[in-house]
Amino acid sequence: MSFFNEDGKVWMNGRLVPWKDANIHIASHVIHYGSSLFEGFRAYETPRGTVVFRLDGHIKRLYNSCKMYRMDVPYTMEEFTRAVLETVRANAFRSCYIRPIIYRGYNTLGVDPFP
């Protein structure tokens, strides 16, 4: 399956949305200053179904990065973990690369997002 599966679903702002509707505002801090963090990991097809490799460790590392970057995440690690699994299921992925991104939105603008 192509990375650009326009018929797929993306988890964004707490819910699954159609891929085509996963957009961010032009005034978002991330667009102007690149203020985002990401992780990259894989899910694999196994005889017992799809398994996300070391999911808890990846989510913990992402949240730790957000803490160091002073970026609040509006979801608990458990909610975020469920979101990853829900997205994999919603797209019927058996094997895939997962790239969660957390970014600063459009509530602040300027080099220092902490006025």
Which residues fall in each region the model found?
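Conserved alpha/beta cores of soluble small-molecule-handling proteins
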Residues: 1-115
